[in-house]
């Protein structure tokens, strides 16, 4: 099998041959090979170090999303159009040319696999395993109904394709003990998501926030963040968006941000969304605490949409204190408008029969037994909590529907 080093040399040699048509091709190849060796020895910082190398440091091996395309583009001398749209179907696992570990933060770690069958066009996909596979698939179905910006994904079980995928990934990474061990540990899990990968994304805490959220486009981006918050509220995912003000969380850690919108107008992609019910009892303190926080936020938004709510102010203060991210006070109004629009969409499209039907559909995707993680995950999805949230939302909207100050979205 070709190594990434062989592939890199071939691309560099081809480019040099085009620029030096009158030179002898064999001499060019030998000279380039010598130069590559010298450059690797004398100036390794300027040459791409493929992931297939002996690296025993996890932080060194991991990449962050914004660096990925620049690395490949810089070192393979390729143009934007030569990166094809991420294709998660009919993957030829024999064409792997690179493997990276991406740490998105907040315990979200994926494999980024680059494939190419002709050395001219490239396909990049994410491989993700998760202990909350059932909840994540369940949330993805609901997100699709609400037209939220989820990445294209499909479920991969331990079948023939899994065997082909695993054998090729392990064979390609055999010279890198750390990467190989990481892949082996991932393959001990039962279910995997094959996910689309969008180029040029950044994590929320890596943005130039003043520049990114400036102007009219910035207002639209804040509204889109509000829609995402609305869904996380609905799923009791306070650990993600931290509406309750928990200092241990990182806001928006489950999104990737882009400079240009996708075909549906979204500037963001969701890479992780779970139904994370903290408890299932109506009578526990935690349950009522979250419900009361939700009611307070809804009341604030629908009662005074142009006034920053307590929860959104807590969010901005947290971002400034913990991450040194300063969002302007004016952002609160647009975020709250987005939350209101997201809530209205939930009320219009989600109901209790749909929640139960979705649970049944997800349960039927794979065969379940009484012991596997999928079955336990499905059983942990607590529809009564979601129904309680939905009821609270519907009550607030009903109470405010006739008011002139109802938020205009």
UniProtKB/Swiss-Prot annotation:
Q: Name one Pfam family in it.
A: Act-Frag_cataly
Question: Record's Gene3D superfamilies?
Answer: Phosphatidylinositol 3-/4-kinase, catalytic domain, Phosphatidylinositol 3-kinase Catalytic Subunit, Chain A, domain 4
Coiled coil stretches, renumbered: 5-46
Q: Where is this region: Disordered?
A: 1-45
Q: Where is the composition biased (Low complexity)?
A: 13-45
Q: Which GO MF terms does the UniProt record name?
A: kinase activity
Query: Which keywords does the record carry?
Result: Coiled coil, Kinase, Transferase
The answer, when asked if Isomerase is one of the entry's keywords, is: no
The family line of this record is: Belongs to the protein kinase superfamily. AFK Ser/Thr protein kinase family.
Q: What is this protein called?
A: Putative actin-fragmin kinase DDB_G0268812
**Which species does the entry assign this protein to?**
Dictyostelium discoideum
